[in-house]
């Protein structure tokens, strides 16, 4: 009796799910995809997917179903995409701007990554103000100051012994991001909270137990409580900073004080993102949204710039000719007592771009369609992707396409000097990264003195790629240093 009732319920649920998605199914008949079981869809494709086997499984999937396909999981329609033709159409479209990053909603809610499409343009303009010419120069000066601390730490490890560069580089990047956004050097507790919270979300990614919000609420109550506690601690710090800035502004108005005299960071000339958001006096910009913006920029800056720098150093170490070319360029571009002219470091810029082509820090770019998306395609024809589709662009596979990039798996910085190909690591169109120029300048500011002061040696194991929200290495970023 119980088995019969269960079977009937399963059949009814399957029928309901099928008929509810009839229109969606009719619009994607031209797309290949895995076999779809009743109710569960192609759940078997995700069941054993892990951060470590993601890249092997992804390559196998694309080989079998193509770079533009469909995959049903229960009632959800996924569109795995590694096709530049359609990716460009989607990313450059100014209507479909929803990113669909529900996993991090508790932490990054209200930030630029998750704000509504109608708010995006205004928020993008505010953040872009952080990187205008005058302020950008001050941020680069701040980066140079942090680089001095980085060199001191690296000098202690320059004994030609293998170590993981991540644990030296990432704290410096984190400090830089927080000083850029909040205008204050983070305390040890703040840094630890941000790292711990990032690690919780990294563990949740690709986990059937905790990726879904309901499953996470049900199966991981202790982790969920810890996550919420860490979010509260970070936001309490942000609220304290907001209150401090508001009181300083009041003092400045009443007593003519210079607000910058009260700032607790070594270099006081740059304007922080927090100041820009507060000075905008936008009545629609709430305290919660400001916290979300600070959390978003701190997280993205820390989690994307740190692996980019580490992958670049490991790659340079294993390509001696590339390292020598970088050194020659640094010698030519050096300014006495002022570091380097970053604009003249074209080859180093190409090395960074080629590294991010092979190892894009953000492997997956998502879009969630709120309405039908008409497209044209040279292979599958002209059609529409239905409303409700969840599109995930796989940059790792897309940027290793042999048709687009000759010898795609081979490191060749020269390709970005001759006729630079399109790079999607910073996205395209209206939702592209507003910090693109700053992040490239930051990476060059950190890389240049490292290469000038140390020979980077290819010791240790090769990186073993894994995907936990951002691209990483399961065995770290191993290399050795030798003083020049």
From Swiss-Prot:
Signal sequence residues: none
Gene3D superfamilies, sorted: Cytochrome P450
Residue positions binding heme: 433
Keyword set includes Thylakoid: no
A Pfam family: p450
Topology within the bilayer: Peripheral membrane protein
Cofactor annotation: heme
Enzyme class, first EC level, given as a word: oxidoreductase
Tagged with keyword Ribonucleoprotein: no
Subcellular localization, as worded in the UniProt entry: Endoplasmic reticulum membrane; Microsome membrane
One Gene Ontology cellular component annotation held by this UniProt entry: endoplasmic reticulum membrane
EC number, UniProt record: 1.14.-.-
Keywords for the protein's UniProt record, in alphabetical order: Endoplasmic reticulum, Heme, Iron, Membrane, Metal-binding, Microsome, Monooxygenase, Oxidoreductase
InterPro entries: Cyt_P450, Cyt_P450_sf, Cytochrome_P450_Monoox
GO molecular function: heme binding; iron ion binding; monooxygenase activity; oxidoreductase activity, acting on paired donors, with incorporation or reduction of molecular oxygen
PANTHER family: CYTOCHROME P450 4C3-RELATED, CYTOCHROME P450 FAMILY 4
Similarity-based family: Belongs to the cytochrome P450 family.
Function per UniProt: May be involved in the metabolism of insect hormones and in the breakdown of synthetic insecticides.
Descriptive protein name: Probable cytochrome P450 316a1
Source taxonomy: Eukaryota, Metazoa, Ecdysozoa, Arthropoda, Hexapoda
